[in-house]
Amino acid sequence: MIVKSRYVLAGIALLYSSVAAAGITLGGTRIIYPQKSKETSILVKNDGNQDIMIQSWIEPDVAFKGKDVPFALTPALSRLATGKQQTLRVFYYGQGLPGDKESVFWLNVQEIPQKAEGDNTLQLAIRQRIKVFYRPDAMTGSSAEAASGLKWRVQDESGKRYLRVTNDSLYHVSFGTTQYKSDGKTYPVDTEMVSPLSTGKFPVKGAPVGSIDKRSVVEYYNINDYGAPIKHTVSVFE
């Protein structure tokens, strides 16, 4: 059994030593699509050492699951030579989305190597995924104000501590690192994007339940329109 295990491990090491190098770079970490724009776009570059095929598509977030995607994307399938770049163009059909708040979708870009360099080469189809935010002209406020205006509260439930966050804005808020600081200790918080006019509940890892230090704060980073993390520190009692 020990001998067999050694052969298996050796085989795995040999296989991964021959993985084909490939990689695409997107020209941004998100796409902002204002209603007044006829289209929006993003650059895709092949930084790998071989030519690849690129397949791209847009899919809905949870709020639009099961519904038609009101966007067109071109080119949906194309060849991209090593070191070259191309533009992906996104078009909104003009109907199907709320006119008073932001909507979010996902742009998927998948690279498919065209041919193997040898019989023992492992070919990988790697997918990148970024958010597409559609913003109607009728929206008020800004994404920056949305991020800074979040309301945080502590909630203990079933023997665990949570942070409840309320987003009263018309924008989505995406998070980077979030921490809960209480009684001189720091606890990580598992956060995810909060939709417009909604509330999220996030677990605080390792935090005790019961009494709440009135000096407790939440330190969080939101990801702005340019993909940069912006730091905020707020009290959970305000």
Q: Where are the model-predicted features located?
A:
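Bacterial N-terminal signal peptides that target proteins for export
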Residues: 1-11
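N-terminal signal peptide c-region/cleavage motif recognized by signal peptidases
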Residues: 17-19
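Beta-sheet-dominated interaction scaffolds and their linkers
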Residues: 22-45, 142-157
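Surface-exposed binding patches on compact interaction domains or structured appendages
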Residues: 25, 43-91, 176, 182-183
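Short, solvent-exposed loop/turn segments enriched in Ser/Thr/Gly
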Residues: 35-41, 100-105, 159-161, 216
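Asparagine-centered strand-capping/turn motif at beta-strand->loop junctions
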Residues: 44-48, 163-169
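Intrinsically disordered, low-complexity Pro/Gly/Ser/Thr-rich segments with frequent PxxP/GP/PP motifs
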Residues: 69-97, 184-211
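Terminal connector regions
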Residues: 95-139, 209-238
